[in-house]
Design a protein with these regions (language model features):
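Domain-level signature for proteins that mediate thiol-based redox and metal-cofactor handling
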Residues: 1-195
């Protein structure tokens, strides 16, 4: 696909001014995860420490700027670098990412499926996750209407898999096969420092 024709737009990441999700069809199909190496010009921004972390999904790329950079100054350059680099060879992706799965899941819940969640008169929260599994809390919906809870869980899982195909399973608190694992869900940041 000609990069000039590829639609792309930025989406702010709540509570993280250094992060932007660039909504763009990446063409990666089943390849998602942390970008370790990228072709230029995107790769040059990583090597030059303009970009500190990039996570690739099928419908976007999440980008964190290194401290000392801002989107007002770097946004256009990052956008152009994404467009010029996506169709080039040389991408090396670190297979799966618990951080990316959580980001995609929260974005699906609060964005793509926000109307369905609101219509179900419930809240949805990602309680735990690893790189291939999610535990969801669907609020009081399961006790009020287990069938509606199962349907909402399935819709969430399907929407996430479109963007993160490595998702293998979801469970819900109070639902069938629910369990509670103790996992660290603190997102890590690959931020460079001069220390």
């Amino acid at each position: 696909m000609n990069h000039a024709m590829r639609p792309i737009h930025p989406q702010a990441v709540p509570d993280d001014p250094l992060a932007v999700r660039w909504v763009v069809h990446t063409g990666t199909q089943g390849v998602v995860g942390e970008v370790v190496v990228a072709p230029d010009p995107f790769g040059a921004l990583m090597r030059d420490r303009v970009i500190s972390l990039a996570l690739l999904e099928t419908e976007g790329i999440w980008v964190w700027l290194a401290p000392g950079n801002n989107w007002a100054d770097r946004g256009h350059k990052v956008r152009q670098a994404i467009l010029e680099s996506l169709d080039r060879d040389g991408w090396h992706i670190n297979g799966d990412s618990a951080d990316l799965l959580r980001l995609v899941a929260n974005d699906v819940i609060s964005g793509d499926l926000a109307d369905e969640v609101h219509a179900a008169d419930t809240t949805v929260e990602v309680v735990e996750n690893d790189a291939q599994w999610l535990l969801l809390d669907l609020g009081q919906l399961d006790s009020r209407d287990p069938a509606a809870s199962a349907e909402l869980q399935q819709r969430i899982e399907t929407a996430i898999r479109v963007r993160y195909p490595l998702l293998q399973d979801t469970a819900r608190l109070g639902g069938p096969q629910s369990s509670h694992f103790t996992l660290s869900n603190t997102p890590r940041r690959a931020l460079w420092t001069d220390d």
